[in-house]
From Swiss-Prot:
Coiled-coil residues: none
Source organism of the structure: Caenorhabditis elegans
One of the protein's GO biological processes: positive regulation of protein catabolic process
Superkingdom per UniProt: Eukaryota
Assembly, per entry: Interacts with ODC1 and thereby sterically blocks ODC homodimerization.
Protein name: Ornithine decarboxylase antizyme
Role of this protein: Ornithine decarboxylase (ODC) antizyme protein that negatively regulates ODC activity and intracellular polyamine biosynthesis and uptake in response to increased intracellular polyamine levels. Binds to ODC monomers, inhibiting the assembly of the functional ODC homodimer, and targets the monomers for ubiquitin-independent proteolytic destruction by the 26S proteasome.
GO cellular component: cytoplasm; nucleus
PROSITE patterns: ODC_AZ
Family (UniProt): Belongs to the ODC antizyme family.
Length: 159
């Protein structure tokens, strides 16, 4: 799949990533209880999550500023999506750009959409929409240890 990114992202992706261009805050998002905040965090141990280029966060934020992203291992990109993510208002082009970036630039093998299980219905809303673009529910017995099936509903997309 060839990547068609906007010129802002294309210029940045041509630069080499060095240590200063890596966002260390992506190893874990702090939990927040402030009004308006999404109210969840990645609760994986620091050694499990991998640093990503700042460019990754910019591309994810172009889809939705409320999404959080990290890499689990070398070949899996995980995106935490708030339970109240509206279906409307998400740019289809930006979402496809994100999937292409994960494949072409980050060389990921899969993208995980992670939802708090207690706060969503897997057959409605945004999880339902993701099924139309090729995301499939992740088998409960395949959940990463730090994203337990009791707490998270995960959908997987093979890039």
């Amino acid at each position: 799949m060839s990547s068609i990114l906007s010129s802002n992202f294309t210029n940045k992706s041509n630069q080499l990533v060095n240590e200063s261009a890596v966002d260390s805050s992506l190893t874990a998002s702090p939990c927040s209880t402030q009004p308006g905040d999404v109210g969840w965090c990645f609760d994986a141990p620091h050694g499990v999550l991998t640093k990503l280029p700042n460019e990754t966060r910019a591309i994810v934020s172009a889809v939705s500023p409320n999404w959080r992203v990290t890499s689990i291992g070398e070949k899996t990109l995980a995106i935490m999506i708030p339970h109240d993510q509206p279906v409307l208002g998400i740019s289809k082009k930006n979402f496809v750009d994100l999937l292409e970036f994960a494949e072409d630039k980050l060389e990921m093998e899969r993208v995980l959409a992670v939802f708090e299980k207690a706060r969503i219905n897997p057959t409605e809303g945004f999880p339902r929409t993701l099924r139309y673009v090729g995301f499939r529910p992740y088998a409960i017995d395949e959940h990463p240890v730090h994203l337990p099936a009791e707490k998270y509903f995960i959908m997987s997309y093979k890039v």
